[in-house]
Each structure stands twice: as C-alpha cells, then as structure tokens.
C-alpha cells in the first residue's frame, strides 16, 4: 500500500511541476511584439533607437542588457518614457526624452517596456 501511495505522490508532483512550468512560460510569452513595435513606430522611438543598432540613443538590446536582472527595470523604463526626463546624446548634449504618456494606455506602455526588456 505504501508503494502505491509513493508512486501516486511522485506522479502528482510531476503533474504539478509541469503545470507550474506551463503557466510560468505563458506569462513570459505575453509580450505582443507587433503591438510594441507599432507603438514605438507611432511615437518615433526608432528615430533614436534601433532594436540592435545604436543610433542617437542606445539600441534596445543594450537597454535590455543594462537592466537585465534588476527588480526595478520595468518601473525605471516606464518612468523614462513617460516623464520626459533628460536623455544624454553621444555628442554630450541633453534633450528631453520623448514622453509617450497620454499617447498610449498603461498596458500598451508596459507591453513596450516588456518587449524591450525581452531582447
């Protein structure tokens, strides 16, 4: 009887692990890449940022690398693109960063930031 109980527990544990992995993977797959790129185009983000190539601003892959593993990464990037704070350019001058607050919903902004961080 004890052997059947142990086998059942192992099988149940395996199913729970598979379910947990499946649901956690789905949360990472929630980024709508097309919507993120569309929002970036609509707000002229690609004028200064390339996906993987520097322009006047850093490439999004570099932004992702800079913030990778940091707990406050999403909040910092959302603040940066919604506050109009200063952006530093390669030649040393500073300008107000384009502010997309009011031009997109909070969910669209979060999706854009999540896409950038996924690169």
Question: For each of these PLM feature ranges, what is it?
Answer:
Residues 14-23:
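Bacterial N-terminal signal peptides
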Residues 43-51, 112:
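The canonical Cys-X-X-Cys-His
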Residues 33, 50-53, 57, 70-74, ...:
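Solvent-exposed, acidic/flexible segments
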Residues 2-15:
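Bacterial N-terminal signal peptides that target proteins for export
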Residues 25-40, 66-70:
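Electrostatic cytochrome c docking/interface patches
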Residues 56-67, 80-110:
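Axial heme c-ligation environment in periplasmic c-type cytochrome domains
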């Amino acid at each position: 009887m004890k052997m059947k109980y142990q086998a059942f527990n192992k099988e149940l544990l395996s199913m729970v692990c598979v379910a947990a992995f499946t649901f956690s993977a789905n949360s990472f797959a929630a980024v709508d890449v097309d919507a993120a790129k569309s929002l970036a185009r609509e707000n002229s983000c690609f004028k200064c940022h390339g996906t993987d190539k520097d322009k006047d601003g850093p490439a999004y892959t570099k932004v992702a690398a800079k913030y990778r593993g940091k707990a406050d990464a999403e909040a910092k990037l959302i603040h940066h693109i919604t506050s109009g704070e200063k952006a530093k350019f390669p030649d040393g001058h500073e300008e107000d960063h384009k502010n997309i607050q009011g031009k997109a919903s909070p969910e669209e902004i979060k999706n854009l930031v999540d896409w950038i961080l996924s690169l």
